[in-house]
Amino acid sequence: MSSATSLVPPAAPDMREHELGECAAFYAAETPQRLFENLLHLENALKARGYDTDSAGAPALGPTTLTMEAIADRITLIINRFKAAVRLDLELYRLLAELVHIRIRTKTVSMQAWIELRGLSRECAEFILERKNFVCELMERFGEVYPTLSRVGLQSARKFESMYLGKLKNGRLESVGQFFLRIAAEAARGVANNDAFAAAVFRDGTRAPDANTVFCLFFMALCRQEIVPPTPVMLFAGTESRSYASCFLLDVRGRHTRDVLTSIAEEIIPVMHSHGGIGLYMDCDSNWDDNSSGMMLALKALDSIIAASNAVSARPSGLCVYVEPWHRDIMKILRCRGVLAGNEETRCDNTFFALWMPDLFMKRFEANGTWTLFDGRAAHLSDLYGEEFEKEYELLERKNVGIATYPARDVMFALIKSAVSTGTPFVMFKHAVNRNYFFDMAGRAMKCSNLCTEIVHMTDDESVGVCNLTSLNLAAFVTRRNALPGTPPIGTFDYSSFRDACAVATVFINALMSLSNLPIKRATTGNERLRSIGIGVQGFHTACLLQGFGLDSVEACRFNGKLFEALALTTFQTSCRICELGMNPFRGFSESKYAKGWLHMDGWPARHLYFDGWDRLRENIKAYGLYNCQLVALMPTASSSQLTEVSEGIHPVFGNIFSKITTTGEDIQLNVALMETIECLYPNKAERRDILERLHKNKWSTRGAFGAALPSQHPLTKFDTAFEADQEHLLRLSADRAPFVDHSQSTTLYVVEEDDGAVRASRVAHLLTTAFKYGLKTGMYYCKVRKATDNGVFLGTDTCRRDDPTCLACQ
């Protein structure tokens, strides 16, 4: 997305003795002199733009003080001195990013030392060592893309440094190239002995690549940030841990509180220690303790365990408990977080909650009807959905089995009050989830999703749901051409390259899944049985902006439909191709709807199609099967999107600038597409500065800064933020892509306080009803609120932070 200007590719020629013919660079380490030259080059570039680096307070570097530590310290002082000014200077933002990458390089070690210090598994280390010369070739290719990568942005560089690069002994770091190499090597190792995986990596099916070709393919896709792995893979790929699964769905069927506590000890805690995000259903069995607070006490125990675990974990985990709205404790659950929790004994601030919403509740709400709560005598309702659920629910009402009755609107408004005050509950629609599943779920309905509401997966006595994720960076597939002077460049989306990457990503995540360690036996069973994967996207809004249109445009609607059709078609073709090449379909395929020619999109008969190939795919699936039971999931990507500096997942940008105060000053992330557009429109520095200052005074809202002064087709009008976007239109986009998303999508709602500081519950209720009528599986992930008096996003306590466990667990 940006051109490189200065960073010299890392290659240092300090060699030690090595065997004849081996790649010398394998033993090479960075040198202070090399990095000092890079630093001087960048300092000169900063001075040319008016930033006097000598004023940062750093001592001058000379022959006697030229150490790695001194270089790193000088870089830190320069960054802290000028980072607040990036809001007015995109090039400064990129130059400071390059400085961070030099600081990273002051802490790196040679490839040989990295293999010894990183804690790689024996198998991954051997895979790399057997290919020393080829690895050196890969690092040369990395040197060609590293200048561009190092200029993605300051936020990206700092995220690599602080979180994703492996920490070695004595304060050393793995390099960015080693980071990508580790992930690619582990995935290639999963392909090395699987000819079907290797052949399926190319869409044309005419090539049978060797392990090195696949290794290179994975490596370059990662370096170019086309494929962005989830956080578990980035942290643990190739290590002894091998914890690659992102999502676990557990169904706890306890007859007593002690049964739930046993399950916590035997299954939930091991999964938490594997750093996976958890979606949990807790049964409302007839034999729960007579004390009506039994479930709440169990939840409190679980909440305390989550808090204790995260307090000592380098990577926090998160857990979401799914409850149906007829549950006897529903009103208590809606008052157990944040400012709504009046009783410390039942406060559960570390636990997320979600409502597994039956259609009948939404119908009762719309009709202004009543809603009945039940105890464990109605536990079997959890196994039913659709008409079966409605008939049984109404029968129980007629038999007076209920323990309390409320106006349905009271329950809905309690839900909304909790959502806007504390961040939860999330909302998923039970009927839409089960109706569109590839198995007939009559009498055995699915009861929960995952932590982030985008995974649909069955559980039973023998297995829990497991899903392995990855995402595609859509901005990486936008090819931009030079525009006329004074106009921003307009990009074109490369569907061919995107579909190639879809095939690579499908094999990539399957390869990692085949090597993954899982924390409990039921997870291993679930993983081996269904091989569920979720391939999603990040940068949807950014890709729209780079193509010259906003989310509310006709072009965005067309792009949305075509993009996700391409994603679904290609991933399913690849999964089918793996079976055609000799691998067995997922267990239970012959009993699935797929075996009869069904596809997920058949639930939306009015869909529009852009691509040929669906009819042939149906026939091939019937003939050969599918290796994976599900393939497309649109997860939030709050953490990994900071590496690519694109918009999160399918979501619009929160604001055109992100800012937080730290101990070293203000850290800022820019909307690079907006800054590039402003630079093109206003080449005069003084005029451009005036425009940026105007935006700053209006909280970086182009609508607030310019209002009606901008013509409707002006390039800046497309930069509306999430809170300025038409929420019904965002839901329409979700509905249009829904046929091609066989898992689900983390649908977030964005609302703004009224001038009196209130959030209108009727507004949120209308959006939930709209999502329900569109047939979405996820009605509401987060409900994010912007204060009327501020542009900062808040969510009750601090659940909107970018280190939120819900963000880290998935992506």
From Swiss-Prot:
Disulfide bridge positions per record: 247-467
Enzyme class: oxidoreductase
UniProt-annotated binding residues for substrate: 231, 246-247, 277, 450-454, 636-640
Site (Important for electron transfer): 781-782
Entries under Gene3D superfamilies matching the protein: 3.20.70.20
Catalytic site: 450, 452, 454
GO biological process: deoxyribonucleotide biosynthetic process; DNA replication; release from viral latency
Interacts with thioredoxin/glutaredoxin (site feature) positions: 807, 810
Catalytic activity: a 2'-deoxyribonucleoside 5'-diphosphate + [thioredoxin]-disulfide + H2O = a ribonucleoside 5'-diphosphate + [thioredoxin]-dithiol
Listed GO MF terms: ATP binding; ribonucleoside-diphosphate reductase activity, thioredoxin disulfide as acceptor
Site positions for Important for hydrogen atom transfer: 247, 467
EC number: 1.17.4.1
UniProt keyword annotations, A-Z: ATP-binding, Disulfide bond, DNA replication, Early protein, Host-virus interaction, Nucleotide-binding, Oxidoreductase, Viral latency, Viral reactivation from latency
Entry-linked NCBIfam families: NrdE_NrdA (TIGR02506)
Family: Belongs to the ribonucleoside diphosphate reductase large chain family.
Name the UniProt record assigns to this protein: Ribonucleoside-diphosphate reductase large subunit
The organism of origin for this protein: Psittacid herpesvirus 1 (isolate Amazon parrot/-/97-0001/1997) (PsHV-1)
Gene name of the encoded protein: RIR1
